[in-house]
């Protein structure tokens, strides 16, 4: 079976994904053997960054998961917004929420970096769908806080992750406090392996209905904050559905789904913290991770 036939069998068309193929959990995966070429390349990328890099990659074609520092905790920063939007969609599937419901808020509710919500205070407000879109595509912090409030706060998001089988990911605070990224603080953290497994369940598995899964994928494909990270060095024809995160202490992240021209997805969780220097240097780390991930597909073609 060639890769194009494989993609067709997945039922993929512009990110439409068949369910059921990857429902088996792999929460125990932590690290690929240290002698593996992928690990060595990630180690070299980390060394040049001056920080601590954690990466997990799931190749849907081979079924292989690669991980470097896969079991170590890293600050999520805004990557949690993917999970929060997934939980909103889960509640829609359960009949507990409606994407058309309008949420009204005031100027006093605004927090730093709210490029979308700052224009809709007062009587107008925004729908739940609009808040999800703003949180994912623009990383709007107030939108994320309003979504958290809609389902009961950070603890409820953590509970959703536990019910989904993720025993590691936790959210404890709201924006902007969760971006503190203090070394050794377990609050608002995940591990690369746990996040990739959650992405498998949410984006490729049965956690969401087909309609909700497609909606989440569409929002992620429209993300406007990731051009310099995972997608920056990808070959022509690749598409990326991702969510970035940026915090204090030299922290920058990018997670999501890389779609080859044939449509076969790679799931990537790339977390970096403690990296000195300019933001552009941290962006470049994730760009190199994305290129490395894509090379796994290229080598198999």
Task: Locate predicted features.
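Structured C-terminal helix/loop/strand segments within mature extracytoplasmic catalytic/sensor domains
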Residues: 2-15, 26-42, 149-150, 154-155, ...
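Beta-lactamase-like hydrolase cores
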Residues: 26-73
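Sec/Tat-exported extracytoplasmic proteins
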Residues: 46-49, 86-96, 107, 136-139, ...
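Soluble periplasmic/extracytoplasmic beta-strand elements of cell-envelope proteins
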Residues: 54-58, 67, 83, 104, ...
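Active-site SXXK
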Residues: 63, 75-103, 135, 268
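Short, glycine/proline-biased beta-turn/loop segments that scaffold the active-site neighborhood
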Residues: 94-120
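Conserved catalytic neighborhood of penicillin-recognizing serine enzymes
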Residues: 110-146, 154, 188
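Mid-domain, small-residue-enriched loop/turn segments at the edges of structured enzyme/sensor domains
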Residues: 132, 145-207
């Amino acid at each position: 079976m060639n890769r194009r036939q494989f993609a067709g069998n997945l039922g993929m068309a512009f990110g439409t994904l068949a369910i059921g193929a990857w429902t088996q959990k792999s929460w125990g995966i932590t690290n690929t053997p240290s002698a593996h070429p992928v690990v060595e390349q990630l180690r070299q990328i980390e060394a040049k960054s001056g920080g601590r890099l954690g990466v997990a990659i799931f190749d849907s074609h081979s079924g292989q998961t690669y991980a470097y520092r896969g079991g170590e905790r890293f600050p999520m920063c805004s990557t949690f917004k993917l999970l929060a939007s997934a939980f909103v969609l889960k509640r829609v599937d359960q009949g507990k929420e409606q994407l058309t419901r309008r949420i009204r808020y005031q100027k006093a509710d605004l927090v730093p970096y709210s490029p979308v919500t700052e224009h809709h205070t007062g009587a107008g407000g925004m729908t739940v769908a609009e808040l999800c879109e703003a949180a994912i595509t623009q990383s709007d912090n107030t939108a994320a806080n309003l979504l958290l409030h809609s389902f009961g706060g950070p603890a409820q998001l953590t509970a959703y992750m536990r019910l989904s089988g993720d025993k590691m990911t936790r959210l404890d605070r709201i924006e902007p406090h969760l971006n503190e990224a203090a070394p050794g603080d377990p609050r608002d953290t995940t591990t690369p392996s746990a996040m990739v497994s959650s992405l498998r369940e949410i984006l490729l598995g049965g956690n969401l209905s087909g309609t909700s899964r497609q909606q989440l994928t569409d929002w992620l494909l429209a993300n406007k904050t990731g051009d310099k990270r995972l997608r920056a060095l990808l070959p022509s024809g690749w598409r990326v559905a991702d969510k970035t995160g940026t915090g204090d202490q030299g922290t920058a992240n990018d997670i999501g789904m890389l779609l080859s021209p044939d449509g076969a997805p790679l799931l990537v969780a790339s977390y970096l913290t403690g990296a000195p220097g300019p933001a552009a240097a941290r962006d470049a780390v994730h760009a190199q991770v994305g290129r490395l991930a894509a090379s796994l597909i290229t080598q198999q073609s």
